[in-house]
């Protein structure tokens, strides 16, 4: 299995400004595997310490702040060798170990020669507490579910993955590539990007095992809900989680608390929702009132949409059977195209630094699915789950903000093309959106300069 984050980890290893690393990511997204694989590839050895399996290791951090003594105790207790610069030290399951997290300050200041990477489930929750980590003394990195490109690599389709990365001009994709990529994307909607379900499909072609793996992950997340410090929030978190398919099945996907429970109010459920956001199990996309910078200044905090961390988990949570794979475009269009919108949001979050927003207006109603910030430009994005689409909302957006729109972006089942200032990106190329937008801007500017 190939994870593209390994390249980022190598950059971290080689950086002259390297600090201890905290790798964030949801449960079972592949944090431990990635760090061990990184150590195997690029270090002489790896020293792995799991604080859930060996709770006694925590004591070494509670009795001293001397990093040499801490490492000596860990080596003696575990029998593992640690050599500066040559050993990758992995501290795993550190979410309940504030002393371990805080010790990164001393490793950064007093022992930068040691390469240390920390990981843990629900780290977003732990790090949301002000005193839980040493500000400025660690590097952060986020690992997300496998992208469609990574899915292709895991499935043995290196040729298709290389082709996607080789596209360097905005022109239609040949049928020899378009058709198989379209079929592979349908399968990605079924498996999602969590490594275990992907493995069940790519290595064993076992649909039942894949379904069980997805159910197991969902079950693990639901058990984590009980870890909220205020136990009364547990049922609220669970109700919000289970309402997500219903929220996304509506024509207007704005999150409504009444869908969670009849009569529910924001003040009763907002803490529970924030727990899910901090855990990164859901993504919260605010409504923007206008395409301005900074984007947060234009947020309507009372209006937002919620998406799941992974499209495969959403399919499983919605109880949509894998047999939909063989039913034409059903996976793309089912419950108002929610899977497609969730999939596109996943890809945008990994490519752009600023979390996407959406835009809408009433009377008459128009909605642009996402607004993305690329450098200092805002691009409206529309997601269509079918081919031969029209973009009324993109047209309206340009009418209202003509000076703010350099390019409009549409994801659909249509082929790659640039039609005036509308860039259509096939859904299977969503991973390449940032690069394709850059190519489209160059192509558009080149045409403009040729007119003079």
Where do the model's predicted regions map?
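Interdomain hinge/linker elements that couple catalytic modules in large macromolecular machines
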Residues: 153-346, 356-363
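Short regulatory helix/loop adjacent to the ATP-binding pocket of P-loop NTPases
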Residues: 124-140, 152-157
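Short glycine-rich substrate-engagement loop in P-loop NTPases that contacts/grips substrate
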Residues: 53-84
């Amino acid at each position: 299995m190939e994870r593209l984050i390994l390249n980022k980890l190598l950059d971290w290893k080689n950086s002259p400004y390297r600090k201890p690393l905290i790798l964030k990511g949801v449960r079972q997204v592949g944090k431990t595997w990635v760090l061990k694989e990184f150590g195997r590839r690029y270090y002489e050895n790896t020293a792995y310490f799991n604080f859930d399996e060996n709770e006694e290791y925590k004591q070494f951090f509670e009795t001293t702040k001397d990093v040499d003594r801490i490492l000596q105790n860990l080596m003696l207790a575990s029998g593992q060798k640690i050599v500066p610069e040559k050993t990758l030290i992995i501290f795993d399951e550190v979410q309940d170990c504030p002393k371990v997290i805080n010790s990164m300050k001393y490793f950064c200041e007093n022992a930068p020669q040691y390469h240390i990477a920390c990981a843990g489930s629900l780290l977003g929750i732990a790090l949301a507490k002000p005193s839980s980590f040493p500000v400025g003394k660690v590097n952060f990195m986020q690992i997300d579910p496998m992208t469609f490109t990574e899915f292709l690599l895991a499935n043995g389709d290196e040729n298709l993955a290389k082709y996607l990365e080789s596209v360097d001009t905005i022109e239609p994709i040949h049928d020899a590539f378009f058709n198989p990529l379209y079929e592979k994307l349908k399968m990605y909607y079924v498996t999602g990007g969590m490594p275990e379900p992907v493995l069940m499909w790519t290595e064993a072609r076992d649909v039942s095992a894949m379904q069980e793996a997805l159910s197991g992950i969902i079950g693990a997340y639901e058990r984590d809900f009980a870890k909220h410090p205020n136990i009364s929030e547990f049922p609220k978190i669970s109700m919000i989680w289970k309402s997500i398919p219903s929220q996304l099945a509506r024509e207007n996907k704005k999150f409504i608390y009444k869908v969670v429970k009849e009569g529910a109010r924001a003040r009763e459920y907002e803490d529970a929702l924030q727990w899910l956001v901090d855990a990164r199990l859901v993504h919260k996309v605010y409504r923007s009132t206008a395409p301005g910078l900074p984007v947060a200044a234009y947020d309507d905090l009372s209006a937002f949409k919620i998406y799941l961390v992974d499209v495969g988990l959403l399919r499983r949570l919605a109880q949509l059977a894998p047999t939909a794979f063989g039913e034409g475009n059903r996976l793309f269009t089912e419950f108002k195209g929610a899977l497609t919108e969730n999939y596109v949001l996943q890809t945008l979050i990994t490519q752009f630094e600023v979390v996407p927003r959406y835009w809408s207006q009433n009377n008459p109603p128009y909605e642009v699915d996402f607004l993305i910030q690329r450098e200092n430009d805002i691009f409206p994005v529309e997601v269509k789950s079918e081919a031969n689409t029209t973009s009324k909302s993109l047209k309206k957006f340009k009418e209202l903000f003509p000076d703010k729109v350099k390019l409009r972006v549409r994801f659909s089942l249509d082929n790659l093309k640039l039609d005036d200032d509308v860039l259509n990106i096939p859904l299977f190329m969503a991973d390449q959106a940032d690069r394709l937008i850059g190519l489209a801007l160059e192509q558009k500017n080149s045409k403009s300069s040729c007119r003079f």
